[in-house]
């Protein structure tokens, strides 16, 4: 246990300095997995992506919207490869791999990276925190989460039902749905905490 704690502390400290390589500094042990959802007005399909794929950007289809869901940040090398494959930098990978990072939005030419933290209630009605990053590169959206909990299930349902003609629109509307899901989770969590506090006061 002490060795694990020391390793966690060492990795957390290493992410504070400039480096060619960073590590996931969180507590989740979820193995990194990648799911790709591609859609347009006529079709929608989802598949698993191998982490060993040499180029993730080549999996994108310019005629569709491509949504890569990266669940689990333990494979820091894969996270870094994805980030660099879409034209970002090692420091951006560092932000993605560092939970409780200050909320930030980085804009590059044709790309944007959003880093934030959220919380939600799981199926067991327990509050969970989640470090989330969203990378947008033209028609490609990549979400990074610490766990494989269905944080963006509402967005998937919107795609399946084609809510607000989402499959006809660009990646901007998908981003809006993802951010709306995060905000909804925060509002729900705040409401439940408020109810708990009111019960305690009574």
Give residue spans per PLM region.
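Peripheral, non-transmembrane regulatory/ligand-interaction domains of membrane transport proteins
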Residues: 1-202
